[in-house]
């Protein structure tokens, strides 16, 4: 071993060894238990950031730990390579998205290798390559044949100046990010996949995901949003049509005082035909795109249509209003409004002077007051005719039954979940494999004509998609007839919804090789951010069920266990510029002064200017507080960066980046290196003889095996990697202080250092690879995780706490197998106990075996 720990030399050498020996390349082995560990694959943005490093370090620790358990471990990597940022970067750098993407992949691949992640690089792919998306295109045509794909008009953000569709993130304060033109809402035909056909199964199967965080499952349950209610019809006076509404509160039906409809509802269009003011209001609503989440807080606006709805049970006439809080995309685009029992309806009714009729009162008989706010609790019906006195459930059933008997409604189950719109009016995505013939018929592209290849040699003007601008690209034939290609591309969530499955057989001449897929799937451990809870994780679950129903996989779910890593935070600093805006300064350019408690009291940048400390916030480009992993690896080595990432915080909590912590991790590795070097320089250690150990040696060996037991549980079951590292550090402190005068002292140290090297290997594999060889072993990559010796954990002695009347009066060391009588006798003889019971009568003695003796006396 070199005298000094030199991470750069070691890491380069060990990484060469892994590459040359294809250490992490795996294949199916029916004789070995498999373990598939996957971290969410990166978008090739150009450089890795610390969030990536944290995610991939956790994945590598889990993978290497499972390898040491003797399992056949698959840990693949690839690139989520389509998407809008590549288009933006291409315009900015005057290039095309493809070369920009491929350059980034090469650079980031090198960065991943420098961090020592044990990937099977033979399985690497980029989703922007035709050999990947070709199978996605074919699967889409199969879903179309099954009736699970359809086309309908849907609203998009439209820039009238550029004549182009904008993604939500390209709309800034209601205007186009490029030309500042007010954005409009435009209805265009788009492709959808029927995820709603699987809504109930997606909901039910969450109960089987024991290895998922409860929070993610709750988020998905809410997103799917199953509710039981009643679908009912309001006739429209003077019109030969009905308004269909869905309600989860049919018990409030007798309190309806108006009906709200969406601006996009056909009835709204009809009412506005001869009403310019109404038409203008509809345009205003349509051009204010509202996310469902914003409805609760936005100002409620409406306008009367002049139309009247007829109550289905009591025949009361109620006005029909267009309301900006009713969305066409949700439910039927119409709602029955009960201002007395719904706060949103109450605010609207108060604003427009509409009736507020209470029909539910508290079940406990307390006074009902709807003068200031709606009463939204469930209670007992009144002013509801034949339904008076019924509670919620009884009223629900009775009103539903009456509506059904009269052909005006029925009980139904509703889902908040909407079908998945997969059309994007962008260039850098997989072309949707559909064509339209001259007779207007839409057809899937036949399998023998796939893939529909996205041309990569294009010029980006920053406005129109090159495949929309190039009229020749769309021209094709179908069965010998002229046809036009679909020029929309797939939502990039399509690629990320099945990539985990493609890794099982990346060269397969089909979307999957079922035999290989069923060996590896489901993924045993998936790692990624909680921000993907409702989109990517739900779409992947859906896609897996589609693959199952197409006969490719046997499992119902793609991911057994899910770990959502916390964000990486760093100090952020700024100064205020002449225009009053914030200019963010990189923490690497800031000198800080701290008080006695470590709080920042003063900060100046490289020019000497005072800067404000904004606190510890998520690392991001916009706040200029990202720390480049490359710089840290160059300065301290990959093992140090990995160790800090795993030690600084529990994996699922936020991690505060502190370079002092990185320095601490580096010092610890140097201490381990030094102890191993000093130990190995003395030559081979004598054999361990457990029967020849004295009490101190037994205690130290017990600590070694307690640590093995704790670290094993922390890593395998609890996934509290930080406490596992803390336990190893504690053991290191004890070993450093332990005497090394006898042969058995060295034997215990040898056993301990081998265990520490194996336990640190998943976290800091390069240094452990070297130390393992120095300790006289062969290849740590194929070694086994240490097991603790039950016999070593057995204690010869126990420490008993002595109490008199519940107060601590002393401690007593007894043989581990001492009886209660022996402990009582020794306890009574204790000098301090004698002092406190002198002159008193012992009433009883309470003994907690092996822990405590309490003498009750008065």
UniProtKB/Swiss-Prot annotation:
The keyword Protein biosynthesis applies. It is found in: Cytoplasm. GO terms for molecular function: aminoacyl-tRNA deacylase activity; ATP binding; leucine-tRNA ligase activity. It catalyses: tRNA(Leu) + L-leucine + ATP = L-leucyl-tRNA(Leu) + AMP + diphosphate. InterPro entries: aa-tRNA-synth_I_CS (IPR001412), aa-tRNA-synth_Ia (IPR002300), Leu-tRNA-ligase (IPR002302), Leu_tRNA-synth_edit (IPR025709), M/V/L/I-tRNA-synth_anticd-bd (IPR013155), Methionyl/Leucyl_tRNA_Synth (IPR015413), Rossmann-like_a/b/a_fold (IPR014729), tRNAsynth_Ia_anticodon-bd (IPR009080). Pfam families: Anticodon_1 (PF08264), tRNA-synt_1 (PF00133), tRNA-synt_1_2 (PF13603), tRNA-synt_1g (PF09334). ATP binds at residue 621. One of its GO terms (biological process) is leucyl-tRNA aminoacylation. Its EC number is 6.1.1.4. Keywords: Aminoacyl-tRNA synthetase, ATP-binding, Cytoplasm, Ligase, Nucleotide-binding, Protein biosynthesis. CDD domains: Anticodon_Ia_Leu_BEm, LeuRS_core. It is an enzyme of class 6 (ligase). A motif ('KMSKS' region) lies at residues 618-622. GO terms for cellular component: cytosol. It comes from the Bacteria. A motif ('HIGH' region) lies at residues 42-52. Belongs to the class-I aminoacyl-tRNA synthetase family. This is Leucine--tRNA ligase. It comes from Vibrio cholerae serotype O1 (strain ATCC 39315 / El Tor Inaba N16961).
